[in-house]
Amino acid sequence: MIIKVFLRLLLLCAHIVCIDGKLEIRPVVSGVRIESDVDASGFLGYGDAGELLVEANTEVDLVIFGHGLENVEMVTFTDSVCVTSEFNVSESTFYIHKDMKIVFKYAFVAWPQPWRICLKSECHGLIQIDDDRTWIQAVQSTHETFMPVWAQCAILCLLFSISALCSGLTLGLMALTPQELSILMKSGSQREKKHAAAIYPIRCHGNRLLCTVIIMNVIVNTGITLLFDDLAEGLIAFVASTVGIVVFGEILPQSICVKYGLAVGANTIFITKFFMFLLFPITWPLGKILDKYAGVDIDVVNRSRMVEMLKMNMENDACDIDLSTLKIAIGAMELTKKSVRDVMTDIDDVFMLSEDQVLNAETMTKISDSGYTRIPVFEGNNRNKVKNLLYVSDLALIGKDNNITVKAVARFNKRRLRIVDESMPLTALMDEFKLGDYHLAMVAKATEVKKHHHGKFADGTVDSFILKSMKLVEATMMPQVENPEDHPVTLVGLITLEDITEELLQAEITDETDCYVTDDAQKKRRTNTSKKSAAELFCSEKKSERLSLHMLEMTEKWLLEKTPLFGNMNPKAFENLIQRNIREVLIVPPKNSTSPGTLNLFEAGVMSKRFLLILEGKATIRFNEKDLIFECGPWTCFGEAILEKMEMCISDRKEPSTGFFFLPDYNLTVSGPCRFLQISTSSLLHSLRITQFVKEIRTPKISITSDDDFGSPTRKASILDSSPNSRKRSSTSVMNSLALPTARLAAKIASVEELKPLME
């Protein structure tokens, strides 16, 4: 026992060295450890021999335990002996330096051999710690994954595909309602019908399908995140998984499926069915719960949405539907929302007649200028007391000189008068008009019609007017009474079947009789400029009476002096040519009219085929280019170019044509009574051919009448002498060389008497 104590004292004395009279204890290391958690970065664990395993090039907190450590000036690391130390850690880097503990930070370099600790003090120099439990092995960290990297990459590609499919189906399939699929199955192309038929059965289970694709999408995205976390750590795994899911799992598939969702959904329908089968225990109860509380997926397209869809198609250039067809469809859809008030013509714009007016030329002119065929008739001067209707057809047998009043004609025909409420729907009124009894109705204020018709129009909704057509007519018909004061109403407008048709077609209808059109859509009044004015209505050109003998003789003399074309014309044909082509212009100006009516005989730039000779009255010549106006009186002719062309053609022994014309550079108008001779190219050519034929049959001719008994023909000469009353013509007349074809005349005519019908 005494020996053991002595040996320990010797050992202790061996560790105590005196330097300059100072005792120093030799540093002793009892252990080394990493002062951080086991899972901390850099510490990997312990080796088979008990050495510390740290990650190479990773800074760790190294703790050295023992006693006598306060005199340590430096800590070095070596792989063999202290003389060949590779790294040194000075005392200045110790952030804990005590007698029993030294702590500092250090990053070890990867090395095949473990690093050994060497301590250096002032008295003892380098002291190597050979305990293998104090060794530190720096190794390169190797991350172990769940499975090989190539397998994880393949699984990631598969998961990204499934994620993209689920995201696309969520938008593509759920955007197509069962109603839209049903429409495609009936009216789509062959490919659309096939795809819609494949999707329709599972799309009917909308909530269950929605739960399936959403749950699968969440599961797959979670798997993608886990695999990325296994392949990489920290920020890299987060960024990679986020970018991959957003770009490849959401944006790209949804941008494709929003346009081709039908085709994608149909071609991947077997995958969708597999997912629905796989998740059936989860999605079936969820779908039932959603069906009960969220409702079944039923899309009902109301009228307003359908109208807006049609309007959007009108603005789309790729729409293959005709624009007019879309307008009609929109008009039909919006017709039920409109009432009579929205379509009617305002009462101030309605053309009416007083029953006291006389049907003279002035009134007839107003009626014709209006362009209307049904005209309301009011009592006295009160336009609010409309008592009857006047149809233009009622005036067919009434002359403008009979001075019959409007009241007499209206009461005789007793046309049906209809007064409707301004809030009456157009559909109800159109049902009445379709009966055919009337196509025009007066519109009264709503409160007054309701008052007299027992509240049949209590509200303006369509439902209140869904009645039988005849019942509706009886409920709203204004009774024909002698005293209309018993049912006073305030008229606000007029409506016709044409107004309703225009709303249906979404276009204004203008026929050939429209002069003033009230455009209800644009609220403008348009004027039909192609219609004649009232002053021109009774300006007419017609055939006149025959000329007197004196006037006829003067006309013949003037024509014979004007051109030799008439010189050798048959007298009877010449006389008929004149008498049968006398025309006159009659002008009946409206009463109180400041501008007289005019009639154009020639228009500048418009070809004409007639020759005119004014016999009575005056005409006005206007040269538009030079802005010159002249008045001409009797014995002024126009269209001489036609006679000159005819004369030149005959003198050249050519067959004249009825196609001769001349192009005036002036306007010839008549503003008062005028009588003139009109010779057209056809009538002139006819008279010349008659004259030629008469001349031919009056020349001696030999004709074979019969054979005698000896077989030789008997010749008979017949000479037609000229009439003693025939006029002597100039021998220089062009008719001496007249050679007109007479093929159109009857071949059997042999005498002048038989020519009388043609000459007439």
From Swiss-Prot:
GO molecular function: transmembrane transporter activity
Compartmental location: Cell membrane
Keywords from the named record: Cell membrane, Glycoprotein, Ion transport, Membrane, Signal, Transmembrane, Transmembrane helix, Transport
Entry membrane topology: Multi-pass membrane protein
Ranges of residues in domain CBS: 344-406, 442-512
Residue ranges that the UniProt entry lists as topological domain Cytoplasmic: 175-208, 252-261
Gene Ontology biological-process annotations: determination of adult lifespan; magnesium ion homeostasis; monoatomic ion transport; positive regulation of gonad development
Region (Disordered): 708-734
Disulfide linkage: none
Main location: membrane
Transmembrane spans: 154-174, 209-229, 231-251, 262-282
Disruption-associated phenotype: No visible phenotype. Double knockout with cnnm-3 results in 22% sterility. Quintuple knockout with cnnm-1, cnnm-3, cnnm-4 and cnnm-5 results in a reduced lifespan and 100% sterility.
Signal peptide bounds: 1-21
Entry-listed glycosylation sites: 88, 302, 403, 528, 592, 667
Assigned GO CC terms: plasma membrane
Keyword rRNA processing applies: no
InterPro entries: ACDP, CBS_dom_sf, CNNM, Ion_transp-like_CBS
Residue ranges of every copy of the CNNM transmembrane domain listed in the record: 145-323
Extracellular side: 22-153, 230, 283-760
Domain of life: Eukaryota
Function per UniProt: Probable metal transporter. Probably acts redundantly with the other metal transport proteins cnnm-1, cnnm-3, cnnm-4 and cnnm-5 to regulate Mg(2+) homeostasis.
Family under the similarity heading: Belongs to the ACDP family.
UniProt protein name: Metal transporter cnnm-2
Recorded name of the encoding gene: cnnm-2
